[in-house]
Amino acid sequence: MNVEELVQRYSAGERDFSIIDLRGAVLEEINLSGAILHGAMLDGANLRRANLSQATLSGAALKGADLTQADLSGADLSDAVLDEAILEGAILDSAILDQADLKAANLAGAVLSEADLSEADLEAANLTGADLEVANLHQANLSKAALERANLEGANLEDVNLAGAKLEDAKLEDTVLESGDSTLIS
């Protein structure tokens, strides 16, 4: 299936595009709100400013994909692979990212308020200025992550690996840190 066919089928009311292969495709500003893209292969795809709100992207491959300013609010990205993906300024509020792989992803300025990032791998991710208010990061790997100026107010950081993470000027009011790595600033 190509991009044109995807758009036509979505416009006709179809929503299940599981395991679709659109690696490297240009999907800039596409509206796939509520689409089922479970296991989709979207490595290197251009999804800048795409509307993927409430979409199911569980198990999707998005390595190196560009999701700059994309709307992923309420989306299910559990077990998705987003290594080195660009999510700068993306909206991920209330998104499900449990066990997602976000190693070296760029989430600078992203909105992740109330997102579920439990057991997510965010090693060396850039979360500078990101909004993680009331996010669940239980057992997440944030080693070597850049969290400068991030808003972590009320976030759950229980059993989180923060080794080498940078949290200068981060907002940490009401943050839960029990059993986690208490070395917050390296």
Where are these regions (language model features)?
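Tandem repeat scaffolds
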Residues: N2-S186
